[in-house]
Amino acid sequence: MQIFVKTLTGKTITLEVESSDTIDNVKAKIQDKEGIPPDQQRLIFAGKQLEDGRTLADYNIQKESTLHLVLRLRGGMQIFVKTLTGKTITLEVESSDTIDNVKAKIQDKEGIPPDQQRLIFAGKQLEDGRTLADYNIQKESTLHLVLRLRGGMQIFVKTLTGKTITLEVESSDTIDNVKAKIQDKEGIPPDQQRLIFAGKQLEDGRTLADYNIQKESTLHLVLRLRGGMQIFVKTLTGKTITLEVESSDTIDNVKAKIQDKEGIPPDQQRLIFAGKQLEDGRTLADYNIQKESTLHLVLRLRGGSF
């Protein structure tokens, strides 16, 4: 029968094989075609690395199946894995190691079962069948290990309309994951969602654990309006500044925009609207500040109790 072998460069090789061929045999055929020594080849199918002595039939590899060929780099490399407790583990790996392999190495060192491990790199959760090379993880890169809590937990998400959504999550879920769950329930695209907890806007690549969001915590969902709006900021000297903002911008964001325009550090700014001083972690929407509203900027004098 015919099978296909796809390399990391995207090239696809066609091989004539039999179900009874061993993985060694397949590697020898690849060497004949491509000149790559078998000891530098790793073959992956359905997220599993294939062992030399086993047959294609053992792995249920049928006609026109596609295997993935990853090159085994000579000598390997070190990477670091940082846990939520701050401990750093050093691992000896190769670029061609799959995430499963890495989790197995962590289990060997730390005793944590792979099914309780979530690995994060550059804000992305790593999938078991992919390789370190797939994620461009290079020597001395640092991965973050989050424990997958058995059974998960419930959190609440409150919208500006007052509706409360209940979500089943785990501490190791990223903010991206949470936004995807909200999309599943409410149909709101993630790029229109801003999530706020304890006055902070939550960043996509971080986890609930990073923000100490625990069971039955309540997040606030603010919709990111496409295109935004203009508001005005009036100073005590009578000058009026125009800002481009979104309802979901926090007061911190607005102060940063004022700093960009006027050079006034945020810690010297006080913003007043409708007679109220605005708090940094809250959003414009929280204060019902709409397009063409006018805020008043008062400077906070250094050293004073004002």
Curated annotation (Swiss-Prot):
Entry keyword annotation includes Nucleus: yes
Keyword line: Cytoplasm, Isopeptide bond, Nucleus, Repeat, Ubl conjugation pathway
Transmembrane segments: none
Molecular function terms, GO-annotated: mRNA binding
Protein's cellular compartments: Cytoplasm; Nucleus
Xref: PROSITE patterns: UBIQUITIN_1 (PS00299), UBIQUITIN_2 (PS50053)
Residue ranges annotated as propeptide in the record: 305-306
A Pfam match: ubiquitin
An example Gene Ontology CC term for this record: plant-type vacuole
Example of a GO biological process term: ubiquitin-dependent protein catabolic process
Residue ranges of every copy of the Ubiquitin-like domain listed in the record: 1-76, 77-152, 153-228, 229-304
SUPFAM superfamilies, per database record: Ubiquitin-like
Crosslink position(s): Glycyl lysine isopeptide (Gly-Lys) (interchain with K-? in acceptor proteins): G76
UniProt record similarity statement: Belongs to the ubiquitin family.
Function statement: Ubiquitin exists either covalently attached to another protein, or free (unanchored). When covalently bound, it is conjugated to target proteins via an isopeptide bond either as a monomer (monoubiquitin), a polymer linked via different Lys residues of the ubiquitin (polyubiquitin chains) or a linear polymer linked via the initiator Met of the ubiquitin (linear polyubiquitin chains).
Alphabetical list of PANTHER family matching this protein: UBIQUITIN
More details: Ubiquitin is encoded by 16 different genes. Ubiquitin is generally synthesized as a polyubiquitin precursor with tandem head to tail repeats. Often, there is one to three additional amino acids after the last repeat, removed in the mature protein. Alternatively, ubiquitin extension protein is synthesized as a single copy of ubiquitin fused to a ribosomal protein (either eL40 or eS31) or to a ubiquitin-related protein (either RUB1 or RUB2). Following translation, extension protein is cleaved from ubiquitin.
Protein name as it appears in the record: Polyubiquitin 3
Underlying gene: UBQ3
